[in-house]
Swiss-Prot record:
InterPro entries: Fancl, FANCL_C, FANCL_d2, FANCL_d3, FANCL_d3_sf, FancL_WD-rpt_cont_dom, UBQ-conjugating_enzyme/RWD, Znf_RING/FYVE/PHD. It comes from Homo sapiens (Human). A zinc finger (RING-type) spans 307-363. Zn(2+) 2 binds at C324, C329, C359, C362. It catalyses: S-ubiquitinyl-[E2 ubiquitin-conjugating enzyme]-L-cysteine + [acceptor protein]-L-lysine = [E2 ubiquitin-conjugating enzyme]-L-cysteine + N(6)-ubiquitinyl-[acceptor protein]-L-lysine. This is E3 ubiquitin-protein ligase FANCL. Zn(2+) 1 binds at C307, C310, H334, C337. Ubiquitin ligase protein that mediates monoubiquitination of FANCD2 in the presence of UBE2T, a key step in the DNA damage pathway. Also mediates monoubiquitination of FANCI. May stimulate the ubiquitin release from UBE2W. May be required for proper primordial germ cell proliferation in the embryonic stage, whereas it is probably not needed for spermatogonial proliferation after birth.
Length: 375
């Protein structure tokens, strides 16, 4: 109880008990730099679900549309500190929404100058604008015909204040801005950044068009990694450097040891053959001495076997990446499924982050190395 009271004092230093039994608290809750008066009356058992919340008229007005949520939080919060933290977060949201609702509209010159800038840029570049013209999306096409979007969130003091902008790039996009800047200046910087990344997107598009990419299924333009099928239950994961896209990428293989090890040996032996003048795909073919499975002949289902434990292919966005090393078995599993399975076996043993056990299918020895690798 003392720990809870200390935590409550830290979270809400202006809310204090008004009696010895601590059934009545009164004071202030702070949010967005403002303090709001409130009083909480608890029953003798201190259960929040039977408590009463008395608010000042300012606080009651701000929370007027959130009455049901406040009631739900009181019903389900285990103690007063938990409820106060939830109430504080709710108050922050309510105040933010209120500020946006009652924010003063931009002056007329905001719209006139913005319309003029879009006209200079070309209305064909505008793909979206909300009713207030506070959010707009502009498109651009690179030399290879790919379309790219930039989303701009304009503030009331535009152009004195820089807009927020969002792009789907594999590297940070930092546009310079002065009070004299305009949509034309930020769009020019957007175009320059697109051209600087053309070689990277050429490399990734060739991989997407000519190989079976297992992950990601629908890669955004910002994605630098690809997991490419090499055959049944064997794949290579590559991480391409957007600034040096034709250099040797980070590579690691996924699959049974008896299939993966020969590929690793070839990569080490032939690494000197890597030629930055060639594409990543061509270099991988030369270095690994393989032909990637052709999209024209094979279907993706030829490489996408379900997990042998959960019987699904996709699990929380991941696909099976662990394979039984027994060449007669080769059953794939999700890492987390295999981990939970092995952890439940009395015969399994663990050494650091490696678990040793038996394959659920063939009962041959199987090893699982747990990692924090993102899929």
């Amino acid at each position: 109880m003392a720990v809870t009271e200390a935590s409550l004092l830290r979270q809400c230093p202006l809310l204090l008990p008004q009696n010895r039994s601590k059934t009545v608290y009164e004071g202030f809750i702070s949010a967005q730099g403002r303090d709001f008066h409130l009083r909480i009356v608890l029953p003798e058992d201190l259960q929040l679900k039977n408590a009463r919340l008395l608010c000042s008229w300012q606080l009651r007005t701000i929370l007027s549309g959130y009455h049901r949520i406040v009631q739900q939080r009181m019903q389900h919060s285990p103690d007063l500190m938990s409820f106060m933290m939830e109430l504080k977060m709710l108050l922050e949201v309510a105040l933010k929404n209120r500020q946006e609702l009652y924010a003063l509209p931009p002056p007329p010159q905001f719209y006139s100058s913005l319309i003029e800038e879009i006209g200079t840029l070309g209305w064909d570049k505008l793909v979206y604008a909300d009713t207030c013209f506070s959010t707009i999306k502009l498109k651009a096409e690179d030399a290879s015909g790919r379309e790219h979007l930039i989303t701009l969130k304009l503030k009331a003091k535009y152009p004195a204040e820089s807009p927020d902008y969002f792009v789907d790039f594999p590297v940070p996009f930092c546009a310079s801005w002065t009070p004299q800047s305009s949509l034309i200046s930020i769009y020019s910087q957007f175009l320059a950044a697109i051209e600087s990344l053309k070689a990277f997107w050429d490399v990734m598009d060739e991989i997407d068009e000519k190989t079976w990419v297992l992950e990601p299924e629908k890669p955004p333009r910002s994605a630098t990694a690809r997991r490419i099928a090499l055959g049944n239950n064997v794949s290579i994961n590559i991480e391409v450097d957007p600034r040096h896209p034709t250099m040797l990428p980070e590579c690691f293989f996924l699959g049974a040891d008896h299939v993966v090890k020969p590929l690793g040996i070839k990569l080490s032996r032939n690494i000197h053959l890597w030629d930055p003048e060639n594409s990543v795909l061509q270099n991988l073919k030369d270095v690994l001495e393989i032909d990637f499975p052709a999209r024209a002949i094979l279907e993706k289902s030829d490489f996408t076997m379900d997990c042998g434990i959960c019987y699904a292919y996709q699990l929380d966005g991941t696909i099976p990446d662990q394979v039984c090393d027994n060449s007669q078995c080769g059953q794939p599993f999700h890492q987390i499924c295999l981990y939970e399975w092995l952890r439940g076996l009395l015969t399994s043993r663990q050494s650091f982050n490696i678990i040793f056990g038996e394959c659920p299918y063939c009962s041959k020895p199987i090893t699982l190395k747990m990692s924090g690798r993102k899929h």
